[in-house]
From Swiss-Prot:
Carbohydrate-modified residues: N33, N109, N153, N402, N488
Organism per entry: Rattus norvegicus (Rat)
Protein name: Afamin
Pfam family, one: Serum_albumin
A GO CC term attached to the entry: extracellular space
Domain description: The second albumin domain forms a deep binding pocket that contains palmitoleic acid (in vitro). Palmitoleic acid is most likely not the physiological ligand. Instead, this pocket may accomodate the covalently bound lipid moiety of Wnt family members.
GO biological process, one term: vitamin transport
Taxonomic lineage: Eukaryota, Metazoa, Chordata, Craniata, Vertebrata
Every Albumin domain range: 22-210, 211-403, 404-599
Extent of the signal sequence: 1-21
Disulphides: C77-C86, C99-C114, C113-C124, C148-C193, C224-C270, C269-C277, C289-C303, C302-C313, C340-C385, C384-C393, C416-C462, C461-C470, C483-C499, C498-C509, C580-C589
Length: 608
């Protein structure tokens, strides 16, 4: 987190202080004013987002009080911009208000953050965010008629509540994404409430909004995790690969200039500074649009849009066509006699340019794969440049790159083959076993979620023409969720090694993980007790949840048995459990003497 600059801009209104460089060109002035207007119009939403993300436990009523305080603050500063409090940056102002609200820090356990100042306080609030939101109640759902009545009665309060519920469940989603979600939901509510079949309309409109939020927040969390754990060089490498693939005709100097704005964007957005995040993302899009002729032919229509649609449009625009004169080979980095001298003169720039050059020539590859190839190239030159004839050594670099890609491609092909052969349910059990073996310390809900995400990635990608890049990119996001944002997150030694050793090779590392041998196995009685507790409880729970929970317990109990043995035990136990759950006295069914589960328990003990 030390890598984040943690700088901010003066707050919402704004009287312009020395900390904010004023634009001078007419087009820059227009852009600045448009961004400022957008921020001013969304003060309430931005306060809700920041407050709900920093203190997820806060009630809606408490957040509403903060919004009132913030709006009063805005009015005071508009009346007299010379007040000392009006020069605060966004995060400091919001965190001051959170800390000043009577009893709130003690009630929600963040008073330790309020005792700190400056960088340390911002860091503390950031680490107060919880990715696992299982402690929150289920997302509130209303009957469509009730929903429309609430929207009609007080649309502002209704939409604020929606923004609050979404933000607290997505603490690492960037403010522009959440504002887009709110705009889409408002549009959906307006349209659906005019229809006869409200439930159907809401269902149809909600699915793409949820998917949009999930996709972007997952990517943003993963990239911020890379910044926090591996530092700005890794963040820069990710962005070089992403932008070089999307805009293959961009020049290296133009890309370098653009990435300065992109890095500033991630500094603010990853920290959770809502105003800085909006300003810096707007600046990135303005930068791209001001040079669109030399960057991309696909974004002209996007650049004619206003905030926040412009950013969304550019992000979702198709990749530009690769220049016709651009071959697949990178002769500058494999055929030149001066490679070692150029590497030694300025290593960071040299490898950044290699990644740029290789990425724009191989737009079909995933971002993690491009980073792997760059690491392979670095290691190769480390060896070759110490030899008498370096050229004869690194001349075969392309072969090394192809070997790396072939290994990654084989992994994806195997996963897609499993998807086609097993189907979704069996494949989810496969990944559930795999994740539980590797990380049995994780709660069942998290293991199930990870396995679902992997299946969803394969279901999305395995029929596409860019199957490889799609699977590899999405699978890496799943591993990003497993590894988490906090660099101090610990699961077990082998998982921690994969999460921390090398960002690019995280996926191959996980692919070769064995069962965790440090985990203390539960007893046989614990397994049977877990099964009894599930099937004997009076509440009717989804059978799939019970099966998943039992499978997790089975893997933790007997990680070393074969897949065939595990499937046999899983089938017998769950069949017996379902049968026991349907009789009048299910507890008796689980006794050691019971013919339904007793034999299976003995079989399991033998397997162990």
């Amino acid at each position: 987190m030390r890598h984040l600059k943690l700088t901010g801009f003066i707050f919402f209104l704004l009287s312009l202080t020395e900390s904010l460089a004023l634009p001078t060109k007419p087009q820059d002035v227009d852009h600045f004013n448009a961004t400022q207007k957008f921020i001013n119009e969304n003060v309430a939403y931005l306060t809700i987002i920041a407050s709900a993300q920093y203190v997820q436990e806060a009630s809606f009523e408490e957040v509403e009080m903060l919004v009132k305080v913030m709006l009063d603050y805005k009015d005071r500063c508009l009346a007299d911009s010379t007040l000392p409090e009006c020069s605060k940056i966004a995060n400091d102002a919001i965190q001051d208000m959170l800390c000043d609200m009577k009893g709130l820090p003690q009630k929600h356990n963040f008073s330790h953050c309020c005792r700190q100042a400056g960088f340390q306080r911002r860091l503390c609030f950031f680490y107060n965010k919880k990715a696992n939101v299982g402690f929150l109640p289920p997302f509130p759902t209303l009957d469509p008629e009730e929903k429309c009545q609430a929207y009609k009665n007080n649309s502002e309060s209704f939409l604020n509540l929606y923004m609050y519920e979404v933000a607290r469940r997505n603490p690492f989603a960037f403010a522009p994404v959440l504002l887009n979600v709110a705009a889409r939901f408002e549009e959906a509510a307006t349209t659906c409430c005019e229809q006869q079949q409200k439930a159907t309309y809401f269902q149809d409109k909600a699915a793409p909004i949820t998917q949009y939020l999930k996709a972007l927040s997952s990517y943003q969390r993963n990239v911020c995790g890379a910044l926090l754990k591996f530092g700005p060089k890794t963040l820069n490498s990710i962005n070089i690969a992403v932008f070089s693939k999307k805009f293959p005709k961009i020049g290296f100097e133009d890309l370098t200039s653009l990435l300065e704005d992109v890095s500033s964007m991630y500094d603010g957005c990853c920290e959770g500074d809502v105003v800085q995040c909006i300003r810096s993302q707007s600046q990135v899009m303005h930068h791209i649009c001001s040079k669109q002729d030399s960057i991309s032919s696909k974004i002209k229509a996007c650049c004619e849009k206003k905030l926040p649609e412009r950013a969304d449009c550019i992000i979702n625009a198709n990749k530009d066509d690769r220049p016709e004169d651009l071959s697949l080979r990178t002769p500058k980095f494999t055929d030149s006699e001066n490679v070692c001298q150029e590497r030694d003169s300025e290593q960071d720039k040299f490898f950044a340019e290699f990644l740029y050059d290789y990425s724009r020539r191989h737009t079909e590859l995933s971002t993690p794969e491009l980073l792997r190839i760059t690491k392979v190239y670095k290691d190769l030159l480390e060896d070759c440049c110490n030899r008498k004839n370096p050229l004869s050594c690194y001349r075969h670099a392309e072969d090394k790159f192809n070997e790396t890609t072939e290994r990654s491609l084989a992994m994806v092909q195997q996963e897609c083959k499993q998807f086609q052969e097993l189907g979704k349910d069996a494949l989810q059990r496969h990944f559930l076993v795999k994740f539980t073996k590797a990380a049995p310390q994780l709660p069942m809900e998290e293991l199930v979620s990870l396995s679902k995400e992997m299946v969803a990635a394969l279901a999305t990608c395995c029929t596409l023409s860019d199957e490889f890049a799609c699977v590899d990119n999405l699978a890496d996001l799943v591993l990003g969720e497993l590894c988490g944002m906090n660099k101090n997150r610990t699961i077990n030694p082998t998982v921690d090694h994969c999460c921390r050793a090398d960002f690019a090779f995280r996926r191959p590392c996980f692919e070769h993980l064995k069962a965790d041998t440090t985990y203390a196995l539960p007893s046989v009685s614990a397994l049977v007790s877990a099964l009894r507790a599930d099937w004997c409880q009076p509440l009717k729970e989804d059978l799939q949840n019970k099966r998943h929970r039992f499978l997790v317990n089975l893997v933790k109990w007997m990680p070393e048995i074969t897949d065939e043995e595990r499937l046999c035990l899983f089938t017998k136990f769950t069949a017996a459990g379902e049968e026991c759950g349907n009789i009048q006295k299910p507890e008796a069914c689980f006794s050691p003497e019971s013919s339904k589960t007793g034999d299976v328990s003995q079989d399991a003990e033998k397997q162990r």
